[in-house]
């Protein structure tokens, strides 16, 4: 068994779990179960929102340490589920490193939803939120169109900068300016409802939930880091 390669591939699984919205405890448990499946009992895992460090001691008393950085995060629960399924398969069947590598690549190459569908979804959510907040139908139409533009701007700005708070500030500014002009030229009536409905699209609900779960489970450092990051993004 090449434990160094096992460590490398398992860290890729942990990295992808963390990037796609899994909580810290899920990452730790997944890695620990994988190592135990291959006969490794001395395991030390340190995971925070931006890094994973793992040290293992093999049955031959050799020690290996690797780390991996996490530079960005998103929400892709389909990928999280597939990575969880892969980790369960690994624990049950102990496949070769080559098999694990191929499955990781397969999951990474799995296409996400089409950008056009995601943009339309942003518009539909903004439209629905206006109705929920008792806005007019005209407000809903305006908010829906701004929601589509917001997602397009989000995709564009994300290619320039990975800093989530900065991205949200820029995109929120664009959405606010569009809402002001829409109301000024009588395309909409309630500026506050239009703006709130679009800003709601940027609130990181999954990240906030994971931060609280991490803190409840005792991962205070990771939970606090993620909570602060979430608050900065939301503000």
Give each language-model segment a name:
Residues 1-99:
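Soluble N-terminal domains of membrane-associated systems
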Residues 184-235:
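Generic detector of multi-pass transmembrane helix bundles and their immediately adjacent loops
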